[in-house]
Amino acid sequence: MAKMTVKDLDLKGKKVLVRVDFNVPLKDGVITNDNRISAALPTIKYIIENGGRAILFSHLGRVKEEADKEGKSLAPVAKDLSAKLGTEVVFPGVTRGAELEEAINALEDGQVLLVENTRFEDVDGKKESKNDPELGKYWASLGDGIFVNDAFGTAHRAHASNVGISANVDKAVAGFLLENEIAYIKEAVEKPERPFVAILGGSKVSDKIGVIENLLEKADKVLIGGGMTYTFYKAQGIEIGNSLVEEDKLDIAKELLEKSNGKLILPVDSKEANAFADYTEVRDTEGEAVSEGFLGLDIGPKSIAKFEEALEGAKTVVWNGPMGVFENPDFQAGTIGVMDAIVKQPGVKSIIGGGDSAAAAINLGRADKFSWISTGGGASMELLEGKELPGLSALTEK
């Protein structure tokens, strides 16, 4: 990676501004999944162990008006982070002003401070989300000219707390998490060890058009599963019953199939049910066609076998999107089958592109078997699409 990283800087005695991604799920003020906090620890620890004073910025949820602030404070995160670091994290509970400035100026080497939810600044004119120049300049002024971006989950956004701060400091560098994310995902797509197989699931073709187009050029095979299967089926005139379909994307699906030169591999059967939720019948289809009055909710056993065969000998696998409604035990066999087929390939570099696939791997107990699980759904999608990420472009070149 040609960008500077946190290891390239002398941090001793410096107030170091750090963008992390602490956008964690909360229920009644309790964190239900702390993976993102844990993922930021190596960078935070490196800064404080090298005598820096870490000033952390993160968003939490969406905040558009005053009422949205309810339950969106980073206070529970500060408490959790204090426990993980074994040292008190200073939390003034504000995003600007004298109280914040005094707390920052009182920091000693090796201390950590967490600024309140950056999106609280969105209440009056979307200053954070629209990268308000004054806000970026103000936040940058709180440090000593060093900014570390370790929030891959927001790297595809140009916000005041990443791009805005970057523009107003001497050195904007990558943290360890951001560095690893880029290394794994970008290198997998740009310089893969072959055979390189991409697996794309999820419900909508519209979300993945750019990704499919880019991966058809880069990968040896692209396997399609999930709800978007049925848009590809209908584009070929295959009966899909009541399955999910994007009527306005049929032409694009047909075009992708035609120009794929056989690289695009679709399921050959489905697990169908007579309703999405209150179903009374679940069965495997004979072939591709879904029965009248039924809808496809997972790939079927023949498809799992076909995908296992397609993955045979793969050296690089990138997976984004589940094969079915994996949250329901009746429709998780496809996702489990594909996961198991990926991780059993000898010497495979296996990467999950965040979002629902990451949740599936974690919930179904396979997370530790993958080489890398991305922390950013939207950002990893844009990397897979071959796009430049604003948060990354804003960093200082080596």
From Swiss-Prot:
Its main location: cytoplasm. GO terms for cellular component: cytosol. It is found in: Cytoplasm. It holds the Pfam family PGK. The keyword Iron does not apply. Monomer. This is Phosphoglycerate kinase. It comes from Streptococcus uberis (strain ATCC BAA-854 / 0140J). The gene is pgk.
